[in-house]
Amino acid sequence: MTISSPVIVALDYPDAAQALAMAQQLDPAKVRVKVGKEIFTRSGPAVVDSLHKLGFEVFLDLKFHDIPNTVAGAVAAAADMGVWMVNVHASGGQRMMEGAANAIANHAQRPHLIAVTVLTSMDDSDLQQVGVVDVPKVQVQRLAELAKASGMDGVVCSAQEAGLLKQACGAAFELVTPGIRPQGTAAGDQRRVLTPVQARDAGVDYMVIGRPITQSETPTDVVDTILRSLA
């Protein structure tokens, strides 16, 4: 099943039981779900399989970053798992990204292959500490253009950079954005945040939303409110 919703719910739980309990409260016709490092390390591919059985398309958010052969193998394994989207770190370089793209080029269920540019938790001072002298938007554009040249379908970026990246990389280049918070919710540990409407208007294709949905007493109502605001 392929859905048109831009909302991806981050199932950032320590174990599969909690993630699946939340997933059972959501509608796979309205949202996709994201599986990250902690739950995947604890539960492995079984959690992805369980989410598939519930009808969800899954974004496997493991941000692979290693030598080209290792990343290519990992991305191929993710494709074999049937995930809808998988990501790698753009800072791994062109050969690493090209290897990942080539590894799934002919896969029958090729997932969307996305590169991570600058983590949305990082600001100017964080970049300077790791030797990047440019401000985030400059580094993001540099890595996004490299990702496109390397065969990526799009990038993970902040919504603030979306307009710049659509102009630089084209309308078809997919932008996946965490740090999206519905109006009136806390920013949490994401430093560069926008509301869903602001993100949509900026050019974001897919919005990763976690705690505003998963920590709500009525997660389906929050999803419906977000989708209505985007209609």
UniProtKB/Swiss-Prot annotation:
Its quaternary structure?
Answer: Homodimer.
* Gene name for this UniProt entry: pyrF
The active site consists of: K63
GO MF, one example: orotidine-5'-phosphate decarboxylase activity
Q: Which UniProt keywords apply?
A: Decarboxylase, Lyase, Pyrimidine biosynthesis
One cellular component (GO) term of this entry: cytosol
* Pfam families, per database record: OMPdecase
Pathway listed for it? Answer: Pyrimidine metabolism; UMP biosynthesis via de novo pathway; UMP from orotate: step 2/2
EC annotation from Swiss-Prot or TrEMBL? 4.1.1.23
UniProt xrefs under InterPro entries: Aldolase_TIM, OMPdecase, OMPdecase_AS, OMPdecase_bac, OMPdeCOase_dom, RibuloseP-bd_barrel
| HAMAP family xrefs | OMPdecase_type1_B
Q: Please give the name of this protein.
A: Orotidine 5'-phosphate decarboxylase
- Which positions carry the signal peptide feature in this UniProt record? none
Q: Which GO terms describe its biological process?
A: 'de novo' pyrimidine nucleobase biosynthetic process; 'de novo' UMP biosynthetic process
Upper classification of the source organism reads: Bacteria, Pseudomonadati, Pseudomonadota, Gammaproteobacteria, Oceanospirillales
